[in-house]
A protein has these predicted regions:
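Charged, amphipathic alpha-helical segments and their flanking helix caps
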Residues: 1-29, 43-133
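A short, hydrophobic beta-strand-centered structural micro-motif
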Residues: 33-43
């Protein structure tokens, strides 16, 4: 059984990166984007669906980030919500090289927003749970 994690990250990256900068684990390079997606944690479980083959259930967390620089009440969660909607459209029929996607499920963990004296950061999350064969 081949670990599907890198194939899932590649499929997500290919689907999202043309619309929003997409990174694996952390922002890299010299750019400092204010809107981006991080392909964060991945978990997987083996489901022995029947005696002939295995299925994998793989959960991948997307961290959708929108940063507003400035002091005071800057920015709005609206842009982050719009990003989430767009990303859902981009990934809704995602296919994984070398696997058949049996089921797709989406979970939406609580938002994580923060403010400092110089910026406000809004973060939404989408957990994509794929059942693969």
């Amino acid at each position: 059984m081949v670990n599907p994690n890198k194939y899932i990250r590649k499929a997500i990256f290919d689907a999202v990166n043309a619309t929003y900068p997409c990174f694996d684990t952390q922002v890299t390079g010299k750019k400092n984007p204010t809107q981006y997606v991080i392909i964060s944690t991945q978990d997987k479980d083996i489901d022995k669906a029947n005696k002939c083959n295995y299925r994998l259930e793989v959960a991948t967390l997307l961290d959708i980030v929108c940063i507003y620089n400035g002091v005071g009440n800057v920015g709005s969660r609206l842009a982050n919500d719009d990003m989430e909607n767009t990303i859902m459209t981009l990934i809704e029929n995602i296919q994984i090289t070398g696997y058949t996607v049996i089921n797709r499920r989406y979970e939406f963990p609580s938002n994580l927003d923060s403010s400092t004296s110089t910026q406000t950061v809004y973060r939404n999350f989408i957990r994509i749970v794929l059942t693969l064969e």
